[in-house]
């Protein structure tokens, strides 16, 4: 009986230790991209780029996030990846759920990076974002952030 109690105590210790030290599947290493900034260059191109609170970079977007930063990502996914491939477009609702996750994985694979469905520094540097000229929002030119536009 004492052996059974000792074994049960050991098992409970291991289980509790595992539950306490387990990390979430999508641990965030950067703050959430809560907003976006409309960046312009000298040629007159404007790009909506996700940013963290108070303009913090790098930032990340994960499943379950929502807001203006997710909207900017959805615009990029629609204009630079889904529309050119003839795929169904996302609603730009600011909700990072299954459809945004799948679209991001598609874009990441097209960009040649790890398709994990998480938007962080590598995705920000590798994915293309829509760049518009003038006062119209017609067909965009897609380019990577920090790179010269055509």
Regions found by a protein language model. Give the residues of each.
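Extracytoplasmic/secreted envelope proteins and their assembly/folding machinery
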Residues: 70-74, 101, 124
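Acidic, Ser/Thr/Pro/Gly-enriched interdomain connector segments
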Residues: 24-94, 138-150
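Sec-exported extracytoplasmic/periplasmic mature domains
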Residues: 75-82, 105-113, 128-132
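Periplasmic OmpA-like peptidoglycan-binding domain that tethers envelope proteins to the cell wall
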Residues: 98-105
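Secretory targeting and sorting signals
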Residues: 1-27
